[in-house]
């Protein structure tokens, strides 16, 4: 018959959502734009700026850890923490 369903490898199971949780309801608006791609660069530039700022932050932490940055009055020893 032309109207009969064919036996495919995927069964016809209706999607039944799981338990609706408060966290799921809170996060649902964040996923509402999923799959929609705007033309152009979008927020790529903003992401690049934040990545650069984060890299600068990490470099500052590394310089403090390696004592490359001289901080007057700050000792870098575990004994000073116990006092």
Curated annotation (Swiss-Prot):
Query: Could you describe the post-translational modifications of this protein?
Result: Phosphorylation is a light-dependent reaction catalyzed by a membrane-bound kinase; phosphorylation occurs on Thr residue(s) in the N-terminus of the protein.
List localization entries: Plastid, Chloroplast thylakoid membrane
Provide the transmembrane region boundaries. 45-65
**MF term (GO), any:** phosphate ion binding
Annotated GO biological processes are:
photosynthesis; protein stabilization
Region Disordered, annotated ranges = 1-21
How is this protein situated with respect to the membrane? Single-pass membrane protein
Q: Which UniProt keywords apply?
A: Chloroplast, Membrane, Phosphoprotein, Photosynthesis, Photosystem II, Plastid, Thylakoid, Transmembrane, Transmembrane helix
Output compositional bias ranges, type Polar residues. Answer: 1-11
Q: Name one GO cellular component term.
A: photosystem II
Q: PTM Phosphothreonine: list the residues.
A: 3
Which Pfam families has this protein been placed in? PsbH
Q: Which InterPro entries match?
A: PSII_PsbH, PSII_PsbH_sf
Top-rank taxon = Eukaryota
Signal peptide (UniProt feature, chain positions): none
Role according to the record: One of the components of the core complex of photosystem II (PSII), required for its stability and/or assembly. PSII is a light-driven water:plastoquinone oxidoreductase that uses light energy to abstract electrons from H(2)O, generating O(2) and a proton gradient subsequently used for ATP formation. It consists of a core antenna complex that captures photons, and an electron transfer chain that converts photonic excitation into a charge separation.
Record's subunit section:
PSII is composed of 1 copy each of membrane proteins PsbA, PsbB, PsbC, PsbD, PsbE, PsbF, PsbH, PsbI, PsbJ, PsbK, PsbL, PsbM, PsbT, PsbX, PsbY, PsbZ, Psb30/Ycf12, at least 3 peripheral proteins of the oxygen-evolving complex and a large number of cofactors. It forms dimeric complexes.
Instruction: Please state which protein family the record places this protein in.
Output: Belongs to the PsbH family.
Listed PANTHER family: PHOTOSYSTEM II REACTION CENTER PROTEIN H
Name recorded for this polypeptide: Photosystem II reaction center protein H
| Source organism phylogeny | Eukaryota, Viridiplantae, Chlorophyta, core chlorophytes, Chlorophyceae
